[in-house]
A protein has these predicted regions:
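Activity-critical C-terminal alpha-helical subdomain
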Residues: 29, 273-320
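FAD-binding subdomain of flavoenzyme oxidoreductases
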Residues: 1-104, 301, 317-320
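C-terminal substrate-recognition/cap domain of FAD-linked oxidoreductases
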Residues: 68, 74, 79, 85-251, ...
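Short, hydrophobic/aliphatic alpha-helical segments
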Residues: 31-49, 246-260, 289
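Short hydrophobic alpha-helical segments that form membrane-spanning helices or hydrophobic packing faces
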Residues: 60-62, 197-198, 274, 303-304
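Acidic/polar loop patches that form or flank catalytic/metal-binding clefts of enzymes
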Residues: 31, 100-102, 152-155, 263-265, ...
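Short beta-alpha connecting loops at secondary-structure transitions
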Residues: 76, 182, 271-278
Length: 320
């Protein structure tokens, strides 16, 4: 996992926050990496272990960047007639150098479910915190670009509503308890590909027999692109759940990769995505396996993850 908190536009993902690590290697040695604001001493070893999902060693200590307590904040909510128009606004905001802590876009289905608006409305939320001067400047850019791209100003209370319920997964748990298969799939892609990936991936996952609902939101933005976060739910017979789950993941992932997106933005690979790693990395997969062989020749660290060979013959997912 390369975790991305909900305010990552301001503070970064975990690989941006880690300053140094203590790692126990597969042979028992302990090393210390990083610790300086910036270094130029060969490859940055901290990044070798962050996101390696335990396949190269065990992280036992971490030194993280910290920030002063925010003294100001600002917020706004906007409604768009299309997902693509809102994506363009977000692109323009970050390309101007503004990095609001929260810049999130919900498609019509998720906007209706989370904010009670009509399904034709795509809700964009913006929130920033920090030094008041910087916050005001950031929110001014948000306002200017949203107005320039045809958004309707919605009530700022939608941002407060989001903060109050952002970690509430009770609705999903209700569906799961009724036998639905529910999961999420997050990816990243360049700005030019995002709208196409959104529409085609939703369509591909909906086309899998048994799918009842597929929706998406955009949750992490960068100058060159952003993250799309899909949620799907399906209802099939109990003995068909594994097959459905595999099929909907295959449909979504293949569509994303075909259209130039990534395999994962922050959740990582684990077992479920392992079958796609070789394709996603291309020639880089050989480098990854060479690093694994050099650091862990006996394959004792988290066998079978990241699509790497399992020295102990463990079953992958889906089971062959």
């Amino acid at each position: 996992c390369r975790g991305a908190g909900q305010l990552s536009n301001r503070y970064g993902k975990i690989e941006d926050i880690v300053l140094g690590l203590e790692v126990v290697l597969p042979d028992g040695r302990t090393i210390r990496t990083g610790g300086q604001p910036r270094e130029a001493v060969g490859p940055e070893l901290s990044r070798l272990f962050v996101g390696a999902e335990g396949t190269l060693g065990v992280i036992t200590r971490a030194w993280l960047q910290a920030w002063p307590t925010p003294t100001g904040n600002g917020r706004s909510a906007w409604g768009y007639a299309s997902f693509g128009a809102a994506l363009e606004a977000m692109r323009r905001i970050v390309r101007r150098g503004a990095s609001p802590a929260v810049l999130r876009l919900y498609d019509g289905i998720e906007s209706e479910r989370n904010f009670g608006v009509d399904r034709s409305v795509h809700v964009l939320l913006a929130y920033d915190e920090g030094d008041p001067v910087m916050v005001d400047a950031t929110m001014a850019v948000v306002t200017a670009e949203c107005e320039a791209t045809g958004a309707d100003r919605l009530g700022d209370d939608l941002v407060d509503r989001w903060f109050g319920h952002r970690n509430d997964v009770a609705a999903l748990e209700t569906f799961i308890s009724k036998g639905y298969v529910v999961d999420t799939l997050e990816v990243s892609a360049p700005w030019a590909a995002l709208d196409r990936i959104y529409s085609e991936t939703v369509a591909a996952m909906r086309a899998v027999p048994g799918s009842m609902l597929v929706s998406a939101h955009q949750s992490h933005s960068y100058p060159t692109g952003a993250c799309l976060y899909f949620t799907f739910g399906g209802l099939v017979e109990p003995d068909e759940r594994d097959a459905y789950y595999t099929a909907v993941w295959d449909a979504g992932t293949r569509t994303v990769l075909t259209n130039g997106g990534s395999l994962s933005h922050h959740h990582g690979i684990g077992l479920n995505r392992a079958r796609f790693v070789r394709e996603a990395l291309g020639g880089g997969f050989g480098v990854l396996t060479a690093v694994k062989a050099a650091l862990d020749p006996n394959g004792v660290c988290n066998p079978g993850k990241l699509g790497l060979p399992d020295a102990f013959g463990g079953a992958g997912w889906p089971n062959p």
